[in-house]
Amino acid sequence: VNDLAVAISQSVNANEDINKSITLAGTDVDGDTLLYKITTLPANGYLFQTSDGTTRGDTITSIPTNISYANHQVIYISAKDGNGVNYGNFGFKVNDGTADTEEAIVTINVININDLPSATVQAVSADEDIDKTIILAATDVDGDTLSYKISSLPANGYLFQTSDGSTRGDTIISTPTTVSDTLQRVIYISAQDGYGDGHGNFGFKANDGTADSEETTVTVNVAPKVED
C-alpha cells in the first residue's frame, strides 16, 4: 500500500528586494522519487524557477506549477520595498508518483532594508541683490523623518539659515551644514550685483537617520536688476 509523502513546512527570513533561494523539503517512507509543485502563490512578492539555486528562471505565475530544478529549489523576492512578518508565504505539495501530500506552507518573513532618501532636484529664480527663500525637498519610501544638510556652497552668493522663512540667520559658510529650520528653508542672496543662469547653484543631501542621499543640485538663476 502506498504511503503518502509528507511535505515539510518551514520558516525562512529574507531581506527586502534581495533574492532568497529556498529549498523545498519532503519525505517519503517508501523512498519514492518526489515531485514538488507550488500550490499557492506568495501572498506578496514573486517566485521563480531556478536551474542552479541562484539564477532566476521563469516566474511562477499559476498553480499548480511543478518545480523544474532537481534540487527542488525556488527563488523568492519581495515586491519592491515590501517587508513584514508572513509577508511572502506560499504553499507547496509533494507527489510520490501516485498521490499528492497535504499542502505545506513556507512562511517568509521579509526584513526591512533601509532605502536611501532621494533629494529633489529643483530650479529657482531669484532677483539680483534680493533675498530668496528656498524650500529644500526630498522623499523617502520608508517614511523616515528626514534632516537636510548643505553639501556644496553656492557658486556665487550666500546662503543663510532661517527660523521663519524670511529673516536671515547664521550664514552657512562650511559644508556639510545641517539646515536648522524644521520646514527645511534657507535664504539665498546673490553676490553684490551678480546675476546669471546658474549663478547661485548649491548642493544638498537628505538624511533618513541612517544614511545620506546622493547630492542634489539646486539651480539658482538670478535675474539682473532693471535699472532706472
Regions found by a protein language model. Give the residues of each.
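Proline-enriched interdomain boundary motifs that mark the N-terminal boundary
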Residues: 3-9, 115-121, 226-228
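Acidic, turn/loop-rich segments in luminal/extracellular domains of secretory-pathway
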Residues: 14-16, 21-33, 39-115, 126-131, ...
